[in-house]
Amino acid sequence: MNEYSIERIKLPMQELVGPIRHLLGQLTTKEVEFDLEALERIVLSPSSELFILRGEEVVGMLTIGIYSSPTGRKVWVEDVVVDSRWRGQGLGRELINEAMKYCQRELAPCTLMLTSNPARIEANELYRTSGFEPKHTNVYKYDCL
């Protein structure tokens, strides 16, 4: 069995750009421009945190976005992905658990939220069994280009 660790990335490292780009290719069919500058924007921002799951190589990641509003601090989980070669081993759950522990330890009180496509059956089951509850609301987006 492989050893895995989850690391909160504090400094941008060129060596992470390729593996993150690879994971993004498995997460979305949308073309994503990801380079060192994009990594810098994430890890140097006080409003986001990037967690990397490593074995012998980078095998997964998760990002959280943090903001405050009049109704309290909100934390959004984004871009959760485990490389397809390592799925089915509970590694997505490890990433989610790490994000939850980080929020409890560093950001509480806060509300941790995420969205998931209903077609992603395994991901939705992971979130429900991790303690997330469905929020009956519509999510809308508008791309500012």
Show where each model-derived region lies:
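Conserved N-terminal entry element of GNAT/NAT acetyltransferase domains
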Residues: 1-14
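Active-site rim helix/loop that mediates acceptor-substrate recognition in acyltransferases
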Residues: 29-50
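Residue-level recognition of the GNAT/N-acetyltransferase active site
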Residues: 78, 83, 87, 117
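Conserved active-site alpha-helix within GNAT-family acetyltransferase domains
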Residues: 93, 118-136, 141-142
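Conserved acetyl-CoA-binding loop-helix of GNAT-fold acetyltransferases
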Residues: 82, 88-101, 125, 129
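Conserved GNAT acetyl-CoA-binding A-motif
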Residues: 103-116
